[in-house]
C-alpha cells in the first residue's frame, strides 16, 4: 500500500519543473507596453511667504467651504471672492484673469502717477496744473492744462488731440504686444518679455511665478485705491496725499466720517 502511494505521488510530479517566477509574456499577454512621460507640474514659487505660494492660506476660510477647481492662489474664485460668479466657467475665468492682469498693470502705473503728481506739488515743484483730482475739469476748460508750468512744453489745449495721441501711442504698444514687431516675437501676449521687460525680472521662472501673483494682488489693490482716490477727490476736493496729511495731522476730525454727513461734494 505504501509502495503504491509512493509510486503514485512520484509519477504525478515526474518530469515537471516548478516555476518560481512567471515569464513576462504570461503576465502581460501579447499586448504592447507603451511608456508615457507625464509632464512635470510647475513648481510653485518657493518664497517664504504663505500668501504668494501656490497653496496660499485662504483668508476667507470660514466663508468658503471648498475652492473651485479653476481657483489658483492668484485668482481665488471662492464663493466669497467672486460674488458676481464672474469666474464660474473656466474660459471666463481665464479671460477675466487676462483682463485683470492688463488692467491691474495700468492701474498700478496710474495710482503711482496720481500720488506722484500730488507729491511733486507738495514738494513745491511749481506745477501750474491741478492734481489728478481736478485735472479732468481743467482739461475740459478752454484755458488748458500746462503740465510743466511752461506753456510751450506739454500744453494740452484740445482734449481731442490728447485722445488721438493716446489712441495712437497705446495702439502701437498694444499692437506690438499682441502681434509682435521690431521689439521681438510674441511668446506670451499677457506677459511679453524682451523689450517689455528691460530689467530682466522674468528671467528666473520661480521669481516670475511669484511676481505674477504679486502683480495681480497689487494691481487689484491699485485699482481699488485709484477708485478710492477719485471718491476722495469728489467728496473733499483734495488729492490723496493732501487728505493723508490732513488725516495724520488731526485723525479725530479729518476722516471719512467728517465727510459722511456732507452730501455736497467739494465743500
From Swiss-Prot:
Give disulfide pairs as residue numbers: none
Q: Which residues bind chlorophyll b 5?
A: 166, 263
Residues reported in the UniProt entry to bind chlorophyll b 2: 154, 183
- Annotated residues that bind chlorophyll a 5 are located at 214, 232
Cite the binding residues for chlorophyll a 6: 247, 256
This chain's function reads: The light-harvesting complex (LHC) functions as a light receptor, it captures and delivers excitation energy to photosystems with which it is closely associated.
The subunit structure is:
The LHC complex consists of chlorophyll a-b binding proteins.
The name of this protein is Chlorophyll a-b binding protein 3A, chloroplastic
Taxonomic lineage is: Eukaryota, Viridiplantae, Streptophyta, Embryophyta, Tracheophyta
- Encoding gene per record: CAB3A
Amino acid at each position: 500500500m505504501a509502495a503504491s502511494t509512493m509510486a503514485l505521488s512520484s509519477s504525478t510530479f515526474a518530469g515537471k519543473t516548478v516555476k518560481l517566477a512567471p515569464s513576462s509574456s504570461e503576465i502581460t499577454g501579447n499586448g504592447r507596453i507603451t511608456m508615457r512621460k507625464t509632464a512635470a507640474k510647475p513648481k510653485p514659487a518657493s518664497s517664504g511667504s504663505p500668501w504668494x505660494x501656490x497653496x496660499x492660506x485662504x483668508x476667507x476660510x470660514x466663508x468658503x467651504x471648498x475652492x473651485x477647481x479653476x481657483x489658483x492662489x492668484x485668482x481665488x474664485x471662492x464663493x466669497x471672492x467672486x460674488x458676481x460668479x464672474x469666474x464660474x466657467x473656466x474660459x471666463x475665468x481665464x479671460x477675466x484673469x487676462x483682463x485683470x492682469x492688463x488692467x491691474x498693470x495700468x492701474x498700478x502705473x496710474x495710482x503711482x502717477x496720481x500720488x506722484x503728481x500730488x507729491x511733486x506739488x507738495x514738494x513745491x515743484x511749481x506745477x501750474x496744473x491741478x492734481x489728478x483730482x481736478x485735472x479732468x475739469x481743467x482739461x475740459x476748460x478752454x484755458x488748458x492744462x500746462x503740465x510743466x508750468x511752461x506753456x510751450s512744453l506739454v500744453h494740452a489745449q484740445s482734449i481731442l488731440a490728447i485722445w488721438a495721441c493716446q489712441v495712437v501711442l497705446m495702439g502701437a504698444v498694444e499692437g506690438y504686444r499682441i502681434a509682435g514687431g521690431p521689439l521681438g516675437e510674441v511668446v506670451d501676449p499677457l506677459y511679453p518679455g524682451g523689450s517689455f521687460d528691460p530689467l530682466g525680472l522674468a528671467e528666473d521662472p520661480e521669481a516670475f511665478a511669484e511676481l505674477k501673483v504679486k502683480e495681480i494682488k497689487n494691481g487689484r489693490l491699485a485699482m481699488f485705491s485709484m477708485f478710492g482716490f477719485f471718491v476722495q477727490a469728489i467728496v473733499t476736493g483734495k488729492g490723496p496725499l493732501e487728505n493723508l496729511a490732513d488725516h495724520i495731522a488731526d485723525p479725530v476730525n479729518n476722516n471719512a466720517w467728517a465727510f459722511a454727513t456732507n452730501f455736497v461734494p467739494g465743500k
